[in-house]
Amino acid sequence: ERGVAVMRASREDAPDDASDDAELLASAPDWLLAWFLRDRKLDADKARAKTLKYLEWRRSGYGEHELKLSSEVAEEAASGKAVLLGERDAQNRPVVYVTLTKHDVETRELSRTCRLCVKLVDEALEQLRGEGAGAPETLMCVFDLRGFTMKNADIDFVKFFIKCIFDYFPKRISQVLLIEPPWVFTPVWQIVKPLMGKYAALVKQVKAKDAKAYFAPESTLFDA
């Protein structure tokens, strides 16, 4: 609590636009400030800077309420390319499931895809906050690469996703499964892996039958 208060407080050496920053921080809930404080290892100044960056980003078309009401995001969601599953994984984490064959880089609108991604992460985290103490704090992402071809390879979106992991949702995604990536995915992964840095360790490439181990025994997710 003290760290959150320090983040909200104005500093004597603050620049002239500090009042704008203070107004932004005043609009942020305590849980958000506390999360960035933990991410920055209790360094209030670094956490404050990262939180302000996050809040400014939210103002650029990624506001939670704005995404919920967006007809464009709803149209993108209707494609079924990415969904928040109704079931959790074996660790009770929410799961965002992406079917790559439903995503064509030639016809997609990047902004819509990015905004759908954020909306699904928001929905997962909102679920967890509603469950109170003892609930998981992270989610899993599953990318189903069965049938993947190069027309499904979207490096620009991947760069956005990685930026989200680092800057906007740090330590919120604790597992990424790549389901049966074909050989044509290899050069894509060679580009993506270095961009992920330490987060590359979260990624596991698995067969569909082995992915079942990450879910409850009764799950039928990978039976098809």
Regions found by a protein language model. Give the residues of each.
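Basic, amphipathic alpha-helical/coil surface patches used to engage anionic, phosphate-bearing ligands
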Residues: 1-224
